[in-house]
Amino acid sequence: VIGRALLLGAALLQMNVMNAPPKPKSYIVLASDQITVPANKKATAELRFQVVDGFHVNSHTPKSELLIPTNLKLNVADGIKAGTPEYPKGTEYAFSFEPGEKLDVYTGSFTVKVPVEVSAGEHTLEGTLKYQACDHAACYPPKTLAVKLVVFGK
């Protein structure tokens, strides 16, 4: 009887694991893919990111040194100068098991603004967004999202 109960329990556990929703490959997507700015003048490139429903990512300034901040790193490219990214203010969030500890996170859509100056024509601003995603129960290992934004200087 005990052996059958253990087998039934193992089968139910396996069914729950198999029926659990799969974790996304990426918890964030870059929602903007191209912009147009005045050529040879200071402008702002807005990179809009979308966090997958049910998840949040630590802001650029999380409230704990144990958490990994969201960080945009851009590569140098011909015809385009990019300044220091300006991150939005995060939203306070608390896990249900630790309601007294407030975290600073991004959920839904958030925009990082980057000062740019581009010459006339088409240019590509590339880099990476490093982030740590969490859901209501746990935080996951950090990930890196490749970022590519086409910038037209007119």
Specify the residue positions occupied by each region the protein language model found.
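Extracellular/lumen-exposed scaffold segments
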Residues: N16-K154
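Short hydrophobic transmembrane-like helices used for membrane targeting/insertion
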Residues: V1-I2, V17
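Sec-dependent signal peptide recognition
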Residues: I2-L8
